[in-house]
């Protein structure tokens, strides 16, 4: 038996595309921040974790002519900071677009009324299902399909369940 699947509308595909692009840009931003922190560590400068404070601290270090960062690499590190800020602006733009989608969608409004469901979860659910979950046998099947099941860590006879996997609909 082959289980039939619902075909996504063009709007659902576009909304899902926004989520995927946002995720891609988040990964790019994180990669750049980690690279910056790594370069600073190589020159003996410890920068605390966290995107906002970390980037601002690195900017101050690069602006200080007496810091341990060699002049040869300062310009390139400043370009990395510009890339991070560009990614943050792009992510914010997508989040504004998602906010508008949530305001215009009755299904999103209903989902947002549930405690613990925010903008990203509600719009991702609408992108995945168009707000209609009647074709799922029960809530457990929907949660599993959507990726809200715990990640399993097993070894020998021990079995531990971790945080939710968030790997559904891929």
Task: Label every model-predicted segment.
Residues 110-170:
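Phosphate-backbone recognition surface of nucleic-acid-processing proteins
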């Amino acid at each position: 038996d082959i289980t039939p699947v619902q075909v996504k509308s063009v709007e659902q595909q576009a909304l899902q595309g926004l989520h995927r692009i946002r995720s891609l840009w988040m990964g790019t931003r994180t990669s750049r921040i980690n690279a910056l922190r790594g370069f600073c560590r190589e020159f003996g400068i410890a920068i605390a974790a966290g995107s906002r404070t970390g980037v601002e601290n690195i900017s101050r270090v690069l602006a200080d002519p007496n810091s341990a960062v060699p002049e040869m690499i300062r310009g390139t590190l400043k370009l990395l900071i510009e890339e991070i800020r560009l990614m943050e602006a792009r992510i914010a733009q997508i989040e504004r677009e998602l906010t508008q989608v949530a305001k215009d969608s009755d299904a999103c409004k209903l989902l947002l009324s549930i405690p613990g469901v925010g903008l990203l979860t509600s719009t991702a659910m609408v992108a995945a299902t168009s707000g209609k979950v009647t074709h799922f046998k029960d809530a457990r099947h929907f949660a599993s399909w959507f990726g809200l099941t715990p990640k399993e860590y097993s070894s020998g006879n021990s079995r531990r369940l971790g945080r939710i996997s968030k790997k559904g609909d891929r």
